[in-house]
Amino acid sequence: MLEQGLLVTAGVAFLISVALSPLFIPFLRKLKFGQSIRDEGPKSHQKKSGTPTMGGIVIYVSMMVTTLIMAIKFNNLGAEVSLLLLVTFGYGLIGFLDDYIKVVKKRNLGLTSKQKLIGQLVIAIAFFLIGKGQAFHTYIMIPGTDVKFELGWAYFVLVLFMLIGGSNAVNLTDGLDGLLSGTAAIAFGAFSIIAVAQEQFGVAIFCMAVVGAVLGFLVFNANPAKVFMGDTGSLALGGAIAAVAILLKQELLLVIIGGVFVAETLSVIIQVISFKTTGKRVFKMSPLHHHYELCGWSEWRVVVTFWSVGFLLAVLGIYIGVWM
């Protein structure tokens, strides 16, 4: 019965997202909340300048409303769901402030790196202090085995790294129409299956609400995008998926299921290190999706390829996390 409820959860979130987006997009246009495009980016992206951004608000509202309704209905509104909503709201708020400064204050870089990091740290610390011993414990498990390693307070550092790193990695992936919406839906879908296998139905409800919300948003975010989620959406999704992995004790498996996000981040790190040490670039441009664009791939081809890779990694992650 609850498994059917998960499909209903995704369906409800999808419908709310699809219903809200056509109302919210004109509102963003009226406020002139348009995306600015970097001059150093691919030339084909210049035509996207002015496309409404901060659409992540639609994802958040759709996900939050659906999660609360379904979690209450199935009596699963516990510490885990509360923590997930806290992290999603906190990182979404940081993203909102970042977007707001960009589009209203006309400061292209938004929040400073220091301001953003402080905000991310505060949310991550709150997550750890509230959840430790209640929603999760301080050990990690080797995926596909019963082997566990107690980390003690070193787990605190891991939580900070995962939440901050996860939010930034997902944020880097949001560079092409529909890219993040699709890969996020796939990753959260994979974790929902693992959550069901662990009988963590509150986490599963949250994951399926996210799946429905981002797929509904994808209807308007697919190429050519009518709206972007902005940092409001990408930082929230990144923090949320890291929190889900922590609550499911699948910290290491996040590297596989979130492999697309990891690859995007590594491409930036490699590019920076290479340029600073040798003066040469490994990629034509980073993050990785822009490299393939500059190699002559169409935007849609890059997106579908990354979705496909994300799907294969998700299947591998489910196999390791459930059947091994």
UniProtKB/Swiss-Prot annotation:
One of its GO terms (molecular function) is UDP-N-acetylmuramoyl-L-alanyl-D-glutamyl-meso-2,6-diaminopimelyl-D-alanyl-D-alanine:undecaprenyl-phosphate transferase activity. It is a multi-pass membrane protein. One of its GO terms (cellular component) is plasma membrane. HAMAP family: MraY. The chain crosses the membrane at residues 5-25, 52-72, 77-97, 122-142, 149-169, 176-196, 201-221, 227-247, 253-273, 302-322. It is found in: Cell membrane. This is Phospho-N-acetylmuramoyl-pentapeptide-transferase. Keywords: Cell cycle, Cell division, Cell membrane, Cell shape, Cell wall biogenesis/degradation, Magnesium, Membrane, Metal-binding, Peptidoglycan synthesis, Transferase, Transmembrane, Transmembrane helix.
